[in-house]
Amino acid sequence: MDLERVILSAKQKALRINLNQDLYGTFAEIGAGQEVVRHFFRAGGASGTIAKTISAYDKDFSDAIYGKEAKGRYVCESRIDKMLEHEYGLIEERITRDDHPTKQYFAFANTVATINYHKTTQGHGWFGIKFQTSATSEPNTIVLHARFHEQDALLQQQTTGMLGVNLIYGAFYFYKRPKEVLQSLYDNLDRDQLEIDMVQMNGPAFADVDNRLLSLQLVKQGMTDAVIFSPDGRNLSLIHI
């Protein structure tokens, strides 16, 4: 980790984003409350940043919005991809550039399963953000998978909130330095709380990023013990195995 980098609290990060008048987006969270967006509401100044929040908890209602999953799973990579695509598309459809010529749109999403009551299944989740680096740029995406190690659902919810804030902040303020995006994911968190075992960055801002090498940074930085690639070079989570 970069010991010289100043680590901001979740409130400080959320407030800086809220005070940036050009950032504007949607938060869609499933499975662990609205733990990410609450940081932005509590920080203050969120009215110009948050276009909408949504938590489609009921499976039938969620399917009506994002479509059904082939294997019936709701905490999976394809779900996060659909959530990002749908929510970002709605912003472009409903908010005209004539009225908001300088806005950088974004859609944040997570789909999470926290540890169950009997502690027989560990919590995990998919997190993603689709975002612009300028009002005229094509969007980029960052998607990651995390496994939670805490033995309490409430603690895992709190970790979910912190990780989401770190991802959003890193996307906007560190996108030119992908390794720093990774490092910042653990701001105010540690390996005992969660393990990030997959990350994928795509879009014009990451045109020079080799995602396989980026995933190896997860091991190098101590975020996970191993990473997996598909035959075509795509990053996979251990949960795919």
Residue ranges of predicted features:
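Short alpha-helical segments enriched in small residues
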Residues: 2-146
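Long, mid-chain structured domain cores
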Residues: 94-237
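Conserved small/polar residues in nucleotide/adenosyl-binding loops
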Residues: 239-241
